[in-house]
């Protein structure tokens, strides 16, 4: 069977957009979100487990409670708002003593949320540079909080340090 991939997105609209783009690329993809009836969700999950769909694009409805052991790649199309949702999303890979990879796309506005996830996990998550052929990307420089609920704002500017920052910042 082909490798299975789950792509998580935080909204039904994003799930539908990503699914449409992947289908236009002739990829074998299914979608899962709350607009689907329960029977439709069960059918998509059955097709995914059977290997007839090898890419599943889903909201966090799938992050908890599915039991599929051979997912090798989880892609977070965006940063989840809740740190525990992140843990559940990436927990879909590397199950049953298998290796797996989780990638997270982080845009400039989501950097603070991503930093909160790192704080929750009590570790820095490895960051790789955005490939140059994708163009210039913002530097990974999340705004910090001063402990009283107020943000410490930093001056913004163009990042001229090519290759720095978090992988796949868009």
Question: What does each of the following model-derived ranges do?
Answer:
Residues 16, 146-163:
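Short Lys/Arg-rich cationic patches that frequently serve as NLS/NoLS or arginine-rich RNA/DNA-binding motifs
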Residues 1-138:
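Conserved helicase RecA-like core
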Residues 169-170:
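Conserved small/polar residues in nucleotide/adenosyl-binding loops
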Residues 131-153:
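Intrinsically disordered, low-complexity mixed-charge segments
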């Amino acid at each position: 069977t082909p490798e299975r991939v789950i792509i998580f997105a935080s909204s039904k609209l994003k799930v539908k957009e990503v699914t449409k783009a992947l289908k236009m690329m002739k990829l074998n993809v299914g979608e899962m979100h709350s607009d689907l009836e329960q029977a439709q969700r069960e059918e998509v999950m059955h097709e995914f487990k059977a290997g007839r769909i090898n890419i599943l694009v889903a909201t966090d409805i799938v992050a908890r409670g599915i039991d599929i052991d051979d997912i090798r790649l989880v892609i977070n199309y965006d940063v989840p708002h809740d740190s525990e949702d992140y843990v559940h999303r990436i927990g879909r890979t590397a199950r049953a003593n298998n290796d797996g990879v989780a990638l997270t796309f982080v845009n400039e506005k989501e950097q603070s949320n991503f930093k909160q996830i790192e704080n929750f996990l009590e570790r820095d998550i490895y960051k790789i540079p955005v490939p140059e052929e994708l163009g210039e990307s913002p530097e990974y420089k999340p705004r910090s909080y001063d402990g009283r609920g107020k943000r410490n704002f930093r001056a913004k500017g163009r990042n001229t340090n090519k290759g720095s920052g978090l992988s796949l910042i868009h």
